[in-house]
Amino acid sequence: MDYKERIRALREDNDYTQSRIAGLLNIGQNTYADYELGKTRIPVDSLIKLAQFY
């Protein structure tokens, strides 16, 4: 499982929407969707926030 599959699985397993996680990261939902699709690399600060959140 690569990182994009993992962040999606974590989000879905916890019943969170992309919008909720995007709000946590202070980004738009479309940007977060791009993270899950692998279209955009996740900045380190966002990875740290995700790790602390989950």
Predicted regions and their residues:
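DNA major-groove recognition helix of helix-turn-helix/homeodomain DNA-binding modules
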Residues: N26, P43-Y54
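Residues that mark the N-terminal boundary/hinge immediately upstream of a DNA-recognition element
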Residues: R6, T17, P43-S46
